[in-house]
């Protein structure tokens, strides 16, 4: 009897390990709203991922609308979130900066005081982990135009965003940590004001950058010691009907660094190109440049005097390897 009891205890001890090991492998986890996957929500799939994995795992998300506010925490690495179909696999939330914090939320003290949420809590998806890939999926903040509302908030390093739609209004994409790197390929990014902003290093290639209002595309806050901020290569700048006065960027912090090269610029881009955010001193420090752009909005004759047109030799040095400081990405 004693032996049976000991065996029973050993079995109970091993059960949690067996359950954990089911997802502690490189296999794909399937998420589906209709119950045909292993989980119905993306958050549930994230929760079973092992901390600091030394192998890759894919969270495959079937078509559907997933109303979730998500965090990929710093201890999760080597994860790909891949949608079944870019346009029909949608992660959506609707927080904005002026919403009052909920009691028991991220900052209950602020809620008691009646303080608004603020920009940096409004994300639909926050990525704190590194070596993360987002692919074939839509990430949306569908809040009303009542304040800043972040769709994708990036804090990790070495983040790849490929063939995604990033939808929002003000402050759609936030690259939140200086020097950390993110690359966007074949994406559609839309917004109204400062809809790509922050201090991080980011490379955008073959992306459509869609302006929804007469305002500003970028608001980089690159620190002084960081050579590169935002680089847009072979991108297409478009606008909704009636939008015809858009700046390429304004400096959120004095040393903002932004480059557009080999891009197609629509007629909505203002002739002067860049704005100093109402501070003449920013003209001495902001690092705004262009190279080999084309289209109705690419003419350089009327560009502000404090922006630069790169030479062919200078532009040849602007590669993703040099911007990110490593050969493989």
Please report, for each region that a protein language model flagged, where it lies by residue.
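Sequence-level preference for short, compositionally simple segments enriched
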Residues: 21-329
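Bacterial Sec-dependent N-terminal signal peptides
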Residues: 1-24, 104-106
């Amino acid at each position: 009897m004693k032996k049976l009891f000991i065996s029973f205890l050993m079995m109970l001890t091993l059960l949690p390990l067996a359950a954990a090991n089911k997802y502690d492998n490189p296999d794909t986890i399937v998420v589906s709203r209709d119950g045909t996957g292993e989980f119905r929500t993306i958050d549930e799939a994230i929760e079973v991922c092992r901390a600091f994995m030394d192998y890759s795992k894919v969270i495959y998300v079937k078509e559907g609308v997933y109303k979730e506010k998500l965090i990929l925490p710093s201890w999760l690495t080597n994860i790909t979130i891949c949608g079944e179909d870019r346009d029909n696999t949608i992660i959506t939330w609707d927080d904005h900066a002026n919403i009052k914090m909920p009691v028991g939320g991220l900052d209950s003290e602020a809620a008691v005081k009646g303080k608004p949420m603020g920009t940096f809590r409004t994300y639909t998806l926050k990525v704190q982990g590194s070596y993360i890939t987002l692919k074939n999926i839509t990430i949306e903040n569908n809040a009303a135009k009542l304040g800043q509302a972040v769709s994708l908030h990036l804090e990790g390093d070495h983040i790849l965003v490929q063939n995604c739609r990033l939808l929002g209004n003000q402050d759609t994409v936030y690259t939140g940590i200086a020097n950390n790197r993110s690359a966007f390929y074949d994406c559609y990014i839309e917004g109204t004001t400062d809809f790509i902003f922050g201090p991080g290093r980011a490379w955008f290639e073959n992306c459509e950058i869609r302006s929804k209002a007469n305002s500003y595309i970028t608001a980089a806050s690159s620190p002084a010691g960081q050579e590169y901020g935002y680089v847009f290569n072979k991108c297409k700048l478009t606008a909704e009907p009636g939008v015809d006065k858009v700046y390429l960027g304004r400096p959120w912090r004095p040393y903002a660094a932004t480059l557009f090269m080999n891009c197609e610029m629509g007629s909505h881009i203002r002739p002067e190109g860049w704005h100093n955010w109402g501070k003449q001193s920013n003209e001495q420090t902001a690092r705004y440049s262009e190279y080999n752009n084309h289209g109705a909005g690419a003419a350089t004759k009327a560009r502000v005097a404090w922006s630069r047109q790169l030479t062919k030799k200078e532009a040849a040095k602007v590669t993703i390897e040099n911007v990110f400081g490593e050969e493989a990405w």
